[in-house]
Amino acid sequence: MARLKPLPQLWLISDARNDAALGHALAQMPRGGGFIFRHYHLPPAQRRARFDQLARLAGARGHLVALAGSRAEARRWGAELAYGPRGDLVPAHSLREIGRARNAIALLISPAFATRSHPGAKPLGPLRFRLLAARATVPVIALGGMNARTAQRLGWPSWAGIDAFLR
């Protein structure tokens, strides 16, 4: 998909555990952030209805909206970007995955820190995160245990969180 504006530095990612607070979280984020709608837990019709509702809220705050799915699906649903292995925003956990993300406009490298999304997964930590990020040829968004405090510890300006904006 064509990029019309710069990528946001702050991103909110939807998840089953933060669904009830997403409206509040979208309102609390600084204007012009990014919102990645996943909601894999919902049946297709409910997922679409929830996307439409949250995309309206996100758009009212000037947030860029990405849909977890194919680029074609993202276009059909009215999202500005697609999130996923073959999307515009590509999650990456290793050098191999970074290399496979040839058509990405940005990478979400994770897990930067310990995260509730993947309990038991070994976090990269600041050094390994930066080593992976240095190999990327597109902008990198830190993911995994991210909030304002961990972003400062990582020393990385662009980050995404699931729980970070729920307070």
Where are these regions (language model features)?
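Non-catalytic positions within long, well-ordered alpha-helices that form the structural scaffold/packing
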Residues: Q28, R75, G99-N103, Q152-G155
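A general structural motif
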Residues: L7, P30-G34, G62, A104, ...
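Catalytic domains of carbohydrate-active enzymes, especially glycoside hydrolases
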Residues: A25-R38, R76-A79
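Active-site-adjacent beta->alpha loops and helix N-cap segments on the catalytic face
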Residues: A20-A21, Y40-A60, G69-W77, A82-R100, ...
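Glycine-rich phosphate-binding active-site loops on the catalytic face of alpha/beta enzymes
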Residues: L12, F37, A82-G87, A106-P123, ...
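N-terminal amphipathic alpha-helix/helix-capping segment at the start of soluble metabolic enzymes
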Residues: M1-H24
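Short Lys/Arg-rich amphipathic alpha-helical segments
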Residues: L7-P8, G33-Y40, Q46-R47
